[in-house]
A protein has these predicted regions:
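Bacterial N-terminal signal peptides that target proteins for export
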Residues: 2-12
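Short, intrinsically disordered, charge-balanced linker/junction segments flanking boundaries
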Residues: 55-58, 252, 259-267
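Non-catalytic effector/regulatory segments
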Residues: 1-2, 26
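Short, low-complexity, disordered segments immediately C-terminal to signal peptides
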Residues: 25-54, 58
């Protein structure tokens, strides 16, 4: 039993004993009255101490009435992240599609930057689902890895949002789809055009078109492959034919993504 509970029960028992002595001890005269009065004083003292403070096992005393301590958030990677799909979060311009300006306008709902308030969610991290240019609503089929989809806004708006988040102690994670690109990405488009231009039976040469090695092409159909329109070639596309898988074993592809990562991390 905690010290707080012991004090409450002690107070209840003392009050009960005092009431019994008062009811039964009327004939005992002044001594009984003095005893009861002394007991009542002790009860009041115990109740006052129990109401004002509580002492823990370390000997420190904390208020049970009001706690004015400010929330202390450790500076580590264990945070409360809010996964945010911009498309459906908040539309700031009335076009029916959520945007980065909408996220900026509703940032106080997520975290108002004041640890003493309790009207916000109090998150300290945002995981932004893909925000880069794409031909679909979900934006996982990227057409440009170093820009913002026009439906969502501009790089300037993103930078403004990033600054506002950092001012509130919010960290931002970008969902960067590196496993595949869009079939509309210039890399894939150039590789496709090159393959279409090859004479029948000719093998592709990466020195003529380096992007042909950015993806997995094959003359034979395999599971998870889609046919390249207008050719006898197939390409790996595990999700769907609009998202061709990238060849991450290719050093050139890895260097591309090192540069892309630096672009966003340097903002």
């Amino acid at each position: 039993m905690s010290k707080w509970n012991r004090k409450i029960w002690a107070a209840i028992l003392v009050v009960g004993m005092t009431a019994s002595l008062t009811a039964c001890g009327g004939s005992k005269g002044e001594n009984s009255n003095a005893s009861a009065a002394g007991t009542q004083n002790e009860t009041a003292t115990v109740q006052d101490e129990s109401t004002d403070s509580n002492t823990d096992s370390t000997g420190s005393t904390t208020s049970l009435v009001q706690d004015n301590r400010v929330l202390q958030i450790p500076d580590d990677n264990y945070r409360t992240y809010y996964e945010l799909f911009v498309y459906s979060f908040y539309d700031s311009d009335g076009d029916g599609i959520g945007d980065l300006q909408g996220v900026l306008e509703k940032l106080d709902y997520l975290n108002d930057g004041d640890d003493t308030t309790d009207m916000d969610l109090g998150i300290n991290g945002i995981w932004l689902m893909p925000v880069m240019p794409s031909v679909t609503y979900h934006k996982y089929d990227t057409t440009d890895y170093e820009n913002i989809d026009p439906q969502y806004g501009t790089l300037e708006t993103f930078q403004e949002l990033l600054t506002a988040c950092h001012d509130r102690g919010i960290r931002v994670i970008l969902d960067l789809a590196m496993n595949h690109s869009s079939s509309s990405h210039p890399w894939f488009q150039q590789a496709a055009e090159y393959l279409k231009s090859l004479p029948e039976g000719a093998e592709p040469d990466s020195s003529e078109c380096p992007y042909v090695d950015y993806y997995h092409f094959s003359r034979e159909y395999q599971g998870g492959y889609a046919q390249l329109d207008g050719t006898a070639w197939y390409y790996e596309a595990r999700f769907w034919d609009g998202m061709p898988d990238l060849n991450l074993e290719n050093e050139a592809v890895r260097r591309e993504f090192e540069q892309i990562a630096d672009f966003w991390l340097d903002m």
